[in-house]
Amino acid sequence: MSSSTESLPGTLRRTLTTSRAPAATSSQRLKAGYFVSNAFLPRVKANGIHDSASSQRSTTVASTTSTTADAADGSSSTTQPTTAADLPPVDNTLLPHRRRQAQRKAAAAAAAAAANGETPTPLINPDAPTADLAPDASSQLAAAAASAPADSLKRRLSSLLSLSKPRLTVLVVLSAMVPYALYPVPSFLTSSALDTSLAPSLSPLTLLFLTTGTTLCSASANALNMLYEPDTDSKMTRTRTRPLVRRLLTTKAAVLFAVGCGLAGTLALYFGVNPTVSFLGAANIALYAGAYTPLKRISAVNTWVGAIVGGIPPLMGWAAAAGESATGDGTWRELLFASDGSSLGGWLFAGLLFAWQFPHFMPLSWGIRHEYKAAGLRMLAWTNPARNGRVALRYSLAFIPLCVGLSATGVTEWSFAVTSLPVNAWLVWEAIKFWRLEGHKGSARGLFWASVWHLPVIMVLALAQKKGMWGRVWRSVFGEPEEEEGEWVYEDEDEEEGGGVGEVVKGVVKK
């Protein structure tokens, strides 16, 4: 019996042997590969390596042949042949199909660059978290500015707006607005029937000054960051299109924009909110531009300093709301360190944003760790990869007690501690995979996208379960009183007893 017959399953082999059927044609012959064997995955891996090697050899042969033909035709082009060695390196830890995809993209990019006489640019790791991300808002605005006429208003405005990192600024402003809305004001939807001063409510004007001032402070910090490191930005794929790298703006214009936004933002917070919030806004600029940015070249501790910067905006929102209902002199001690513990909610929100920076940034930096290293920026992703995963896991676990703390301090209902648990568990699970696999096999991508969705979901859950909000909504809709109160009546008493002076008691007015 032939070897091809021996490779078939036992039942089919016995049938073919006993029936003595004539040999099957090539179109009818069953192959052993039709039946999935236990060695399927090893064969796929081996085939992937073989295909990659074959594609590299074919690329080398094709480019060499093309170069030889050009030389024979007397071409004057000085373009060097594109070989596998000339292509950007591809991470060997990727899955086979990812590796082949990266090789094809690298070959196509190298061929296009060679045709245009340019130097091939390194490709982003296709397994990195940033592989599926669209260009950020700064890059899009810089591209729009570059396409506009040199002296046009569109070019100048787009370039200046690009300095502010719009998406990051929006996140900063939202992280200040949520604690402002969640501050436990005594009356959220209704005002006091007796004296509105006894039941303070959130002021739309204060919220306007808070958002405007925070936006300007964030824009100032981001512009100063770009002013400090245009040389390192030019070495990284995700930052090489920034306006100062592309010389869309002069350094003088960027300095004026940064200083102007910083002054306007702190003044708006000082006069429109309170001095404590203004100080926090100025401190945020100083820490981000004066400490975090220079530390990136010195130590991986820069990540912790950057996380502190991320935790300040929630404190700003909380202090802004606390200033409206302050019963004392409204100093920073009362707003941030109240003796009755009412400021704990603000610090818990600051802790949430501080902890969130690590499961978000660690997988993001892992995908471009080689670029960080080439640019001279010290990140745990390449200085200590094992610790990089441990840090992401450690701060992912911190979300569980922080969410419970918000319920325990009366900021949210206890249902928030329950509903936030599945979201926090999802983040922890992705962080465990990122730690165990050290970023490989898609674990970095999984944790990055989990962190992207995690924070807004937690914020929405907290807003939807603010302490006492739904009870007040119910009473406001159905007209039920907030508490049982006695009727206000007048009782006449003798002048000898009451002296003719009206005396107010709870539920009763004596006259």
Swiss-Prot record:
Composition bias, Low complexity: 52-79, 104-115, 126-136
GO cellular component: mitochondrial membrane; mitochondrion
Main location: mitochondrion
InterPro entries assigned: Protohaem_IX_farnesylTrfase, Protohaem_IX_farnesylTrfase_mt, UbiA_prenyltransferase, UbiA_prenylTrfase_CS, UbiA_sf
Pfam family, one: UbiA
Record: transit peptide: 1-23
GO process terms (BP): heme A biosynthetic process
Compartment(s): Mitochondrion membrane
Signal peptide: none
Transmembrane segments: 168-188, 197-217, 253-273, 275-295, 303-323, 344-364, 398-418, 444-464
Membrane topology of this protein: Multi-pass membrane protein
The UniProt record lists the keyword Ion transport: no
NCBIfam families in the record: cyoE_ctaB
Purpose of the protein: Converts protoheme IX and farnesyl diphosphate to heme O.
Family of the protein in this entry: Belongs to the UbiA prenyltransferase family.
Protein's name according to its UniProt entry: Protoheme IX farnesyltransferase, mitochondrial
Source organism of this protein record: Neurospora crassa (strain ATCC 24698 / 74-OR23-1A / CBS 708.71 / DSM 1257 / FGSC 987)
Gene it is expressed from: pft-1
